[in-house]
């Protein structure tokens, strides 16, 4: 990004993530969405992220392994493959809909936007971790998450809640 956030860029990046279906139980689909996130994030971040595997599952990381501030999210969804045929990504006024928009691909894009504003500052120690097993309880990534947050002063979970409240824990 050029230092200016544009709503069209946020919507377009969300659309691109949503149109890569990623049900938790489909490892190939989860690997594909991690690849898509890796490519999309390059437009937002000053340094590239990295794709890793943990517990047999793909994850995406950006920044130091133990950042002061960690943005935590996931790229898997509860929606089965083929859902996009019935419920396509759509924008109606100021509302985006489609499988994974709310939980939580729009939050991932918002995280990249936030990082784009701080990632150029050398004193900032921010990182991001995106897993692909949250919808089934984060069993494979639990140790990775625990390790990542150990030295962090703050962890911000990018997943929204239905009533707009701040989430303070994760499955």
Annotate each PLM feature.
Residues 2-101, 122:
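Acidic/His- and Gly-rich active-site-bordering loop/insert found
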Residues 104-171:
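Acidic/histidine-rich catalytic neighborhood of metal-dependent amide-processing enzymes
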């Amino acid at each position: 990004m050029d230092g200016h956030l544009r709503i069209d860029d946020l919507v377009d990046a969300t659309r691109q993530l949503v149109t890569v279906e990623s049900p938790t139980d489909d490892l190939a689909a989860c690997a594909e969405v991690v690849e898509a996130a890796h490519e999309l994030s390059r437009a937002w971040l000053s340094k590239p992220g990295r794709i890793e595997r943990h517990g047999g599952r793909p994850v995406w990381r950006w920044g130091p392994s133990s950042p002061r501030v960690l943005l935590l999210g996931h790229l898997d969804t509860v929606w089965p493959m083929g859902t996009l045929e019935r419920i396509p990504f759509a924008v109606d006024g100021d509302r985006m809909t489609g499988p994974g928009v709310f939980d939580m691909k729009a939050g991932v894009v918002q995280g990249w936007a936030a990082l784009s504003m701080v990632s150029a500052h050398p004193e900032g120690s921010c990182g991001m971790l995106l897993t692909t097993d949250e919808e089934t309880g984060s069993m494979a990534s639990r140790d990775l998450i625990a390790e990542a947050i150990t030295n962090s002063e703050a962890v911000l979970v990018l997943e929204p809640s239905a009533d707009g409240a701040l989430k303070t824990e994760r499955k």
